[in-house]
């Protein structure tokens, strides 16, 4: 299982939100490239980038920052989400050196787009499913649909999606532990690997994820915990490596 540091981009800065609310943000750095360097130096093996402005506006806003990070670390797998709603945007990011693009809102509103993206960019597409009470939320979490997470995940099994990033919005940024039962249930219900996200606070939460014994969970995204110092990236990754030998 990979420990994946999150870098959320808002107005060119590295921030963290609470429960997806743009008005409830904390700025942790005005230099996201330097922040990426910190996590790379700390031993991370993948980075999770989110263009928060892009998620709300429906197109990339902080793309220059994403490109700068990808160019600085050409051998590091990077995944980017937020505002990815066209094949042109995906192509732009792939050419910039990004390893994976995360399709969120567009995947819910136009599932066929995911199939198109997977055909055009095989192995490069991740679907981001963000949920409130088991129902998928869209448009920067501003809207909640009537679509259930597991039902939608199953629709993408035949498309060649590389992974699903599952976020429980109620947990995100609250550092009260992630929704392990539902994450494990999602991993068991689909053949697509799952990356857990939202609410990780400390090493105990990582251990709890490992204790779920869900082989389909291949990663855990962490944000506020590593920024506020309640979780150490290297220590968490070492725990995962020991447990999964």
Curated annotation (Swiss-Prot):
Superkingdom of this protein's organism: Bacteria
Localization in the cell: Cytoplasm
GO BP annotations listed: L-histidine biosynthetic process; L-tryptophan biosynthetic process
Keywords: Amino-acid biosynthesis, Cytoplasm, Histidine biosynthesis, Isomerase
Entry keyword annotation includes Coiled coil: no
Record: active site: 8, 130
Pathway: Amino-acid biosynthesis; L-histidine biosynthesis; L-histidine from 5-phospho-alpha-D-ribose 1-diphosphate: step 4/9
InterPro entries xrefs: Aldolase_TIM, His_biosynth, HisA_bact_arch, Isoase_HisA-like, Isoase_HisA-like_bact, RibuloseP-bd_barrel
GO cellular component: cytoplasm
Protein name per the record: 1-(5-phosphoribosyl)-5-[(5-phosphoribosylamino)methylideneamino] imidazole-4-carboxamide isomerase
Subcellular location, principal: cytoplasm
Chain coiled-coil ranges: none
Enzyme Commission number(s): 5.3.1.16
SUPFAM superfamilies: Ribulose-phoshate binding barrel
One Pfam family in the UniProt entry: His_biosynth
Single annotated GO MF: 1-(5-phosphoribosyl)-5-[(5-phosphoribosylamino)methylideneamino]imidazole-4-carboxamide isomerase activity
Family to which this protein belongs: Belongs to the HisA/HisF family.
Enzyme class: isomerase
Matching PANTHER family: 1-(5-PHOSPHORIBOSYL)-5-[(5-PHOSPHORIBOSYLAMINO)METHYLIDENEAMINO] IMIDAZOLE-4-CARBOXAMIDE ISOMERASE (PTHR43090:SF2)
Reactions this protein catalyses: 1-(5-phospho-beta-D-ribosyl)-5-[(5-phospho-beta-D-ribosylamino)methylideneamino]imidazole-4-carboxamide = 5-[(5-phospho-1-deoxy-D-ribulos-1-ylimino)methylamino]-1-(5-phospho-beta-D-ribosyl)imidazole-4-carboxamide
HAMAP family per the UniProt record, alphabetical: HisA (MF_01014)
């Amino acid at each position: 299982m990979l420990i994946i540091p999150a870098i959320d981009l808002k107005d060119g800065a590295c921030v963290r939100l609470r429960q997806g609310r743009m008005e409830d943000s904390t700025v942790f750095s005005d230099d996201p490239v330097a922040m990426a360097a910190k996590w790379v130096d700390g031993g991370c093996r993948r980075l999770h980038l989110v263009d928060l402005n892009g998620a709300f506006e429906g197109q990339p806003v902080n793309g220059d920052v994403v490109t700068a990070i990808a160019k600085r670390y050409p051998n590091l797998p990077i995944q980017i989400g937020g505002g990815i709603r066209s094949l042109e945007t995906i192509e732009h990011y792939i050419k910039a050196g990004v390893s994976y693009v995360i399709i969120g809102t567009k995947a819910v509103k136009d599932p066929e787009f995911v199939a198109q993206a997977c055909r055009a960019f095989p192995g490069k597409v991740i679907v981001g499913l963000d949920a409130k009470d088991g129902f998928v939320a869209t448009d920067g979490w501003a809207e909640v649909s009537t679509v259930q997470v597991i039902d939608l995940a199953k629709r993408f099994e035949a498309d060649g999606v590389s992974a699903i990033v599952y976020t429980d919005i109620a947990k995100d940024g609250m550092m009260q532990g992630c929704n392990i039962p539902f994450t494990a249930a999602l991993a068991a219900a689909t053949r697509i690997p799952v990356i857990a996200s939202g609410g990780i606070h400390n090493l105990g939460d990582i251990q709890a994820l490992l204790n779920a014994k869900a082989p389909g969970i291949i990663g855990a995204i962490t944000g506020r915990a590593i920024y506020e110092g309640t979780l150490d990236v290297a220590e968490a990754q070492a725990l995962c490596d020991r447990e999964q030998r």
